[in-house]
């Protein structure tokens, strides 16, 4: 039998088979998910831990103020979770007219009045309470540790970080959290996200799991 041993691809891939796989766009997040598996946690625990780390290492794409969605099969039943933030209760036509004038026809582009109530963190708590095995504090531990110790910024994240600085730096709290040196972190620079670590610790205190 003739067989062509020439590999048509520039690199070779070794097939790996496993019972548990955690896949993310950042290795530290995948590592956090796997660590929950090693602790005896399940897929929900791993997903929450990985998602929390993503808000630290890729905050320009996955922030604590984001939304969350989940489709989960528990072995018997399919569950769906929609944690897209709802509109704040005060968002009425009169509210925007009082604050931005009678000609205001839409919410502003930036600032607190431009976003819905964040749903991501509350979704983590809800999923952990109903489907998780590990304490919620354990799930947040890797993200808090990385935020406090710091991590090295990759090129793509640095580019996204630096792009909107001129537009966002005047917003309350933005510069303190994201521009501690008065600028976006450089590629390869160690960034310590202490504001996010503080926020995650506060959430642990309010969670009932």
Task: List PLM regions with ranges.
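Noncatalytic scaffold domains of N-terminal-nucleophile
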Residues: 1-31, 35, 43-206
């Amino acid at each position: 039998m003739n067989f062509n041993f020439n590999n048509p691809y520039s690199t070779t891939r070794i097939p790996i088979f496993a019972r548990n796989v955690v896949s993310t766009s950042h290795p530290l997040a995948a590592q956090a998910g796997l660590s929950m598996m090693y602790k005896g946690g399940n897929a929900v625990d791993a997903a929450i831990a990985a998602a929390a780390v993503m808000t630290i290492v890729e905050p320009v794409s996955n922030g604590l103020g984001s939304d969350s969605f989940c489709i989960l099969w528990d072995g018997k039943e399919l569950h769906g979770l929609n944690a897209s933030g709802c509109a704040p209760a005060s968002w009425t036509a009169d509210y925007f007219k009082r604050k931005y004038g009678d000609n205001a026809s839409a919410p502003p582009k930036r600032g607190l009045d431009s976003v819905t109530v964040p749903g991501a963190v509350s979704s983590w708590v809800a999923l952990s309470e109903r489907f998780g095995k590990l304490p919620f504090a354990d799930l947040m531990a890797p993200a808090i540790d990385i935020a406090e110790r710091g991590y090295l910024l990759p090129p793509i994240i640095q580019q996204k970080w630096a792009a909107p600085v001129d537009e966002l730096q005047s917003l309350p709290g933005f510069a303190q959290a994201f521009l501690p040196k008065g600028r976006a972190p450089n590629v390869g620079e160690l960034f310590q996200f202490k504001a996010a670590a503080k926020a995650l610790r506060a959430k642990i205190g309010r969670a009932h799991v």
